Design a protein with these regions (language model features):
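Short, basic-rich loop-to-helix N-cap that marks the start of a DNA-contacting helix
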Residues: 48-61
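Short, charged recognition helix plus adjacent turn
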Residues: 71-103
Length: 103
C-alpha cells in the first residue's frame, strides 16, 4: 500500500475548481442540473457530504464523465483519511488475519 502525506484532492475541490469554475456555474445551477437542493451541492462542495453511488451517477451525467471517476475520488479521500487517523489505525492494528484469529 502506498502511503502519502499529501491529502488527495477533495470531491468538493474537484467539483468547484475543475468543473464549476471553468463552466462558470454556481451551486444553484449545479443543483438544478442534478435535480437536488442547493444545500446538497453546498455540502458536497464544502466536504460535509460524501459521494454516494446515486450522486456519482448524477455528477457523471451532468459533467460527462463516469460514475467511477467520482467514486474513486471519494474512495481515495476516505482511505487517506483512515490511514492518517491515529484512532482508526489503532483499531485496525488490533485486527488479526483469520488464520491467527481461529488458531
Amino acid at each position: 500500500m502506498i502511503l502519502t502525506k499529501r491529502q488527495p484532492v477533495s470531491v468538493g475541490e474537484m467539483i468547484t475548481e475543475e468543473f464549476m469554475v471553468p463552466l462558470e456555474i454556481n451551486q444553484g445551477q449545479l443543483a438544478s442540473a442534478m435535480g437536488v437542493s442547493r444545500r446538497t451541492v453546498n455540502e458536497l462542495c464544502t466536504g460535509k457530504r460524501s459521494i454516494t453511488v446515486d450522486t456519482a451517477l448524477m455528477l457523471a451525467k451532468v459533467f460527462g464523465n463516469t460514475p467511477n471517476f467520482w467514486l474513486n475520488l471519494q474512495q481515495r479521500n476516505d482511505l487517506w483519511t483512515a490511514l492518517h487517523s491515529p484512532k482508526r489505525m489503532k483499531k485496525i492494528e488490533r485486527v488479526r488475519p483469520i488464520r491467527e484469529a481461529t488458531a
